[in-house]
Amino acid sequence: MKSHLPESPRDREKARRVPEQGASVGGRRLAAELRRLRERAGLTGEEAAERVGWSGSKISRIERHQIGVKLTDLRKLLALYGVDESYRDELLALARESRQRALPQKAAANFPVATYAYAEAEAESVWNWEPQVVPGLLQTPDYARAVRQLWQQMFPGPPGETERWVEVRLLRQQVLTRDPPLQLSVVIDESVLRRRFGDEAVMRRQLEHLSAAAELPNIEIRIYPLAGDLPSLPVGAFSYMQFPQVHDVPLHDIVSVENLDGNYDLEDEQETFRYRVAFEHLAKWSLDPDQSRALIATATRDGWQ
């Protein structure tokens, strides 16, 4: 059944601000640094554009990372901004790496997931709070398929979309086994262990997969328990991503917040700080990793055998 809901103003706005496919965190880092260098040189966007013979909108779009920057154009900007040769070489190297590092094409083609996945692929560590479902990086194929099928009941999509979505989810999980692997810390509400997606066999395999993942040195799983005096928190799912410094160009932490429209990113330091504090408290109030593994084993044995 095809949805006949009208396109919302928010949908139209999201379409206008979609970055080019292939966008990476390295590219965002480069875009932010180009703006900083221009401002340090005392130039407005219009002035910089006039000096290199471009339109003012091109400078703006590069700095907002709506378009990429060619190496020849980058050299022009760095020369205009008076960047010394050593740092110029580092920024050119960053630009090359940003172009080379990409998700598999099937992931890049699925834009609603791709922007988040690009950030996730370049993150050094991710802190993830999940009150409703098993975190995507730890889902089995059958569990992921069951989750997506429920979503499709509410928001029908084209044929084959569920399988493409599951395939992208599995591609994302490669960050856990790369060298060096992503450092993943998750807090999962205990209700997730009891909430059924698929049949009992799907749930049993999913919880067994969680138990195995919890043994890996780069993965920490904590369960936010139902028992005790802890409140039911009005905090939706979010991921807090931290990135390594590359070529002396830092990138602020990014928070990806989930809602019905997909994921939206927060980069303002005051906003991301609140989510950092929230995750630290969620982790502190949760069971420790050993207790969490025991609870997962109990939920597997008692609920899904």
Feature names for model-found ranges:
Residues 199-305:
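C-terminal regulatory/effector modules of DNA-binding transcriptional regulators
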Residues 2-32, 36, 40, 45-50, ...:
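Interdomain hinge/linker segments and adjacent boundary elements that couple functional modules
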